From Swiss-Prot:
This is Transmembrane protease serine 11C. Residues 55-431 are extracellular. GO terms for cellular component: dendrite; extracellular region; perikaryon; plasma membrane. One of its GO terms (molecular function) is serine-type endopeptidase activity. InterPro entries: Pept_S1A_HAT/DESC1, Peptidase_S1_PA, Peptidase_S1_PA_chymotrypsin, Peptidase_S1A, SEA_dom, SEA_dom_sf, Trypsin_dom, TRYPSIN_HIS. Disulfide bonds join 225-241, 350-366, 377-406. Serine protease which has a preference for Arg or Lys in position P1 and uncharged residues in positions P2 and P3. Shows specificity towards FGF2 in vitro. Keywords: Autocatalytic cleavage, Cell membrane, Cell projection, Disulfide bond, Glycoprotein, Hydrolase, Membrane, Protease, Serine protease, Signal-anchor, Transmembrane, Transmembrane helix, Zymogen.
Length: 431
């Protein structure tokens, strides 16, 4: 029994220990509840703050239009061309000024971007027209936000900026989102998607927004030809697309990279075919199409730049042809827009006996490979052949016209040379 006494003592200790642990657990549980309550309150506050922030600074944006005269910059006619070096240099200067203005202000977290949308003339000096984009905050006090942006910009322009701003010419107003986005995307030859490679016959799928000037000409809801957007009203395409049907009522236009999901569909108001085009000859294979209503520019719908009549696209330079044409002669048409990188071939080579034997005239140009591989094909007709300059701007060099089948050796694609018809385009469209 003597060995039983420690056991009773052990039992007493165990019971005491259990009671002590129980009390400790109760205390920890109470502390845990307090801690949990504090954490819950903090998380709730953070969540409410985030909700409040996104309610005040959501996906919507504020847009403003500003214009002002600059007294120390003489107007140059080249400012009328958004792709000219003079225009781009001036735009860069204005955008830098806007960035500096708002990045150094209390609006720096809301400021998104600025862009010069037009340069006009007043008494021999330039007038800047720009659009500003801000995150939409202070929704309950739009006027206060408007005044804050205006005051910040006006005070900056009055100071030492390197530009002599005529303060009396300063104008500031808000602008609706669709119009603002149209203006922000109005520059020709620009795109938001960077190409990853090119393969049309022997081609490769394009990405959404990669070739935003590409349009589909549809007769009775069926894709017949490609076309290129050159303004918010005008498209340019091949005359031979209309040899069987030239009534505008029979045609529709859509954009986007999927034929199955057309974007911005438009009716056709007018079709103007070159007066000297005569099928089956290939000369003067050019036409312009006027839309019934203008398209609004956005990231996926933009215009290509029209080259000047004197602009050169040298032999062996890279160009890209796009379209929904068949992937091989007499093949099926794809749903996804196709792209193909080819090279310009000089007319002398293209007119050789092995190639087209003298059929290439000055109003035509060849592009592709003498070995074949990549080429435009049926259904690509009227679509763009575009060239990228050193500044990353895309110009319309050619219009898909004709060829001997698709991607055959010594039979590259033949295109209408846009520079040759530049004056004709201006006479019909004013562009």
């Amino acid at each position: 029994m003597a060995r039983g006494q420690p056991r009773r003592s052990e039992e007493q200790w165990t019971a005491l220990q259990n009671r002590t642990e129980c009390k400790t657990k109760i205390k920890l549980t109470r502390c845990g509840k307090i801690t949990l309550g504090i954490l819950t309150a903090v998380l709730a506050a953070v969540l409410i703050g985030l909700i409040a922030y996104f309610a005040a600074c959501g996906k919507d944006s504020f847009y403003y239009h500003v214009s002002f005269k600059v007294n120390n910059i003489d107007y140059d006619s080249k400012f009328a061309k958004p792709y000219s070096q003079e225009y781009m240099d001036l735009n860069k200067r204005i955008v830098s000024l806007m960035n500096e203005t708002f990045h150094e202000s209390k609006l720096r977290k809301q400021y998104v971007k600025a862009h010069t949308v037009q340069v006009s003339k007043a008494k021999g000096k330039v007038v800047i027209h720009a659009v500003l984009k801000f995150k939409a905050c202070y929704r309950n006090n739009v006027e206060k936000y408007w005044e804050s942006v205006e005051t910040t910009l006006y005070q900056k322009l009055k100071g030492q900026t390197g530009l002599l701003i005529d303060s009396s010419s300063f104008k500031f107003s808000d602008i609706a989102m669709p119009i603002a986005e149209d203006l922000l995307n109005t520059c020709c030859g620009r795109r938001t998607i960077i190409h990853r490679g090119h393969k049309v016959a022997g081609g490769q799928d394009a990405e959404e927004g990669e070739w935003p000037w590409q349009a589909s000409l549809q007769q009775n809801s069926v894709h017949r030809c490609g076309a290129t957007l050159i303004s918010n009203y005008w498209l340019i395409t091949a005359a031979h697309c209309f040899i069987r049907a030239a009534n505008p009522k029979d045609w529709k236009v859509s954009f986007g990279f999927l034929l199955s999901k057309p974007q911005a569909p438009r009716a056709v108001k007018n079709i103007i075919i070159h007066e000297n085009y005569s099928y089956p000859a290939h000369d003067n294979d050019i036409a312009v199409v006027r839309l019934s209503s203008p398209v609004l520019y956005e990231s996926n719908i933009r215009r290509a730049c029209l080259p000047e009549a004197t602009q050169k696209f040298p032999p062996n330079s890279d160009v890209v042809v796009t379209g929904w044409g068949t992937l091989k002669s007499d093949g099926d048409s794809p749903n996804i827009l196709q792209k193909g990188k080819v090279k310009i071939i000089d007319n002398k080579t293209c007119n050789s006996g092995k190639a087209y034997g003298g059929m290439i005239t000055p109003g035509m140009m060849c592009a592709g490979f003498l070995k074949g591989r990549v080429d435009a094909c049926q259904g690509d007709s009227g679509g763009p052949l575009v060239s990228e300059d050193s500044k990353g701007i895309w110009f319309l060099a050619g219009i898909v016209s004709w060829g001997d089948e698709c991607a055959l050796p010594n039979k590259p694609g033949v295109y209408t040379r846009v520079t040759y018809y530049r004056d004709w385009i201006t006479s019909k469209t004013g562009l």
